[in-house]
From Swiss-Prot:
InterPro entries, sorted: UreD
Organism: Sporosarcina pasteurii (Bacillus pasteurii)
Gene behind this protein: ureD
UniProt subcellular location: Cytoplasm
Keyword Transcription regulation: no
Listed GO MF terms: nickel cation binding
Subunit and interaction comment: UreD, UreF and UreG form a complex that acts as a GTP-hydrolysis-dependent molecular chaperone, activating the urease apoprotein by helping to assemble the nickel containing metallocenter of UreC. The UreE protein probably delivers the nickel.
Recorded GO CC terms: cytoplasm
Reported function: Required for maturation of urease via the functional incorporation of the urease nickel metallocenter.
Protein name according to UniProt: Urease accessory protein UreD
Similarity remark: Belongs to the UreD family.
Keywords per UniProt: Chaperone, Cytoplasm, Nickel insertion
Keyword DNA-binding included in the entry's annotation: no
Length: 257
């Protein structure tokens, strides 16, 4: 997908899509920024099946503002033959452009093996807001950390220098997830990244104080080299976690405006 700023709004100037991946037409629904293009990302097959490899290539040109929203949680089906499912996202954010990627969950089913890599290339005057949740499985069916392996690698490069390198590996057979210093009694891992040119003005201490007020999760925020804010959550209820993450998301989004 390619986005450009034309005629006082951001347009989807190029979109090549191959089933089961689909992108909606741009919507202009942000009352705070009517030029921002909101696009829904749809997985028409209902999930990533064993051996599937999903690829997203997103190029946001200078001055364009984009919000991408997954239509639903990403479901990872079992890998009965031990073959990994994978997803790669390569994103470029041009000068004075912005991308907001709305929070949604990844749900690995029993015996799933999933590898995800996300690489964002941006400039020092562009803006980036990202949220994601890793679920322990289909909790309502009693699947809690029954998947085999999940690997994620999240990178952000600013002006060709690595600003964020955030790998995660959860392998239930090789980790004591309930041990102290691991997940303990929590089930869900939430993460949010916010990068914007004026981030140094953000009050990280005040944000941390408010994060501690939530009775439903453990959370903490940190400032990275005065260029990015990262917030992490551990929670046992997905609904409560989403509410808390959406609240912080809205705060960051308003800060952009």
């Amino acid at each position: 997908m390619e986005f450009q700023y034309r005629g006082n709004k951001t347009v989807l100037s190029n979109c090549y899509q191959n089933p089961p991946l689909r992108a909606s037409r741009p919507l202009y629904i942000n009352p705070a920024n009517r030029s921002e293009a909101t696009v829904y990302l749809v997985e028409t097959s209902g999930g990533i099946v064993e051996g599937d490899h999903n690829v997203f290539d997103i190029d946001i040109k200078e001055g364009a503002d984009v919000c991408l929203i997954p239509q639903s949680a990403t479901k990872i089906y079992p890998s009965y033959n031990g073959i990994w499912s994978s997803q790669d996202m390569d994103i470029t954010i041009g000068p004075k452009a912005s991308l907001s990627f709305k929070t949604e969950a990844v749900i690995p089913f029993e015996q799933a093996r999933f590898n995800s890599k996300t690489v964002i290339q941006m400039t020092s005057d562009s803006t980036f807001l990202w949220g994601d949740i890793l679920s322990p499985g289909r909790v309502a069916r009693g699947e809690v950390f029954e998947y085999t392996d999940v690997r994620t690698n999240f990178q952000v490069w600013m002006d060709d220098e690595c600003l964020i390198y955030d790998p995660l590996l959860i392998s239930k057979d090789n980790m004591g997830l309930k041990k102290m210093g691991m997940l303990e009694d929590h089930l869900f891992i939430g993460s949010m990244w916010f990068v914007t040119p004026t981030i140094e003005e953000f009050d990280i201490r005040e944000l941390n104080e408010r994060l501690q007020e939530s009775p439903h999760s453990k959370a903490s925020a940190s400032m990275l080299e005065g260029k990015a804010v990262n917030v992490r959550w551990l929670a046992s209820d997905l609904v409560d976690l989403k509410k808390e993450m959406n609240r912080i998301w809205d705060e960051f989004a308003n800060y952009i405006v």
